[in-house]
Amino acid sequence: MSPSAGLQFSLYFLQTKKVLWKLTDKEKGLCYILLFTLCFFADQENGGKALASPPGIWKRADVTFDSNTAFSSLVVSANKKTVKNVGVPQVVPDNPERFNSSPCVLGSPGFRSGKHYFEVKYGTQREWAVGIAGKSVKRKGNLMLVPEERIWQMGLWWLRHLETDPGRVHSTSGKITVFVDYNGGNVIFDLNRINTTLKANFNGEEVVPFFYLGGTVSLTTL
């Protein structure tokens, strides 16, 4: 069984432990076997990954990076589908749209209604975050990656939380999918086939894809 199904089994166990403790040892054993089997088959039916897609119909967004907003050490590819932190400030104009203190970049298109999603490929590097931000997000000065700053994000920090050692660097590449339910006020992240939902109050403001790249990180939109 793949690690994702094993993790899913653990999560189901934690969610049902309040019921399981009331059962006899024999009944508990049967429940454990049933949960394990269900997770295994869910894993196999989705090509070795536990199912974790949010319900509903979502419109795929073809996201590109906006080089006019990119921090000086972030280099956007010619096709605007990849961005890399080269670690050295480049000579770029300090226009009002550009982040000047935090290694961030925004993307397009923006969203004002409906249900949308976009996918981003990440590598083995550390310190990155992907999400959305209000179009009015602060560009100058230090930036906190929190909803109070109009930013809803998920990234390597969450992956570290899943590890036994909180300081251990995640060593595999993968994909993160961001679902934006504008009217419902939800931002849903599918990372490692586990969904995490953040409640959001957009206040009618347009929101755009948001990316943070610390260290020598590169991200590619799919």
Swiss-Prot record:
Cellular component annotations (GO), alphabetically ordered: extracellular region
Signal peptide positions (record): 1-44
B30.2/SPRY domain span: 53-159
Tissue: Expressed by the venom gland.
A molecular-function term among this protein's GO annotations: toxin activity
Residue ranges of the propeptide: 45-52, 160-222
Annotated PROSITE patterns: B302_SPRY
Glycan attachment sites: N195
SMART domains: PRY, SPRY
Pfam families: PRY, SPRY
Domain of life: Eukaryota
Record InterPro entries: B30.2/SPRY, B30.2/SPRY_sf, Butyrophylin_SPRY, ConA-like_dom_sf, PRY, SPRY_dom, TRIM/RBCC
Compartmental location: Secreted
Alphabetized UniProt keyword annotations: Glycoprotein, Neurotoxin, Secreted, Signal, Toxin
Biological role: Neurotoxin that produces dose-dependent hypolocomotion and hyperalgesia in mice. May directly act on the central nervous system, as it is 6500-fold more potent when administered intracerebroventricularly than intraperitoneal.
Family recorded in the similarity comment: Belongs to the ohanin/vespryn family.
Protein name, entry field: Vespryn
Organism name: Crotalus adamanteus (Eastern diamondback rattlesnake)
Taxon lineage: Eukaryota, Metazoa, Chordata, Craniata, Vertebrata
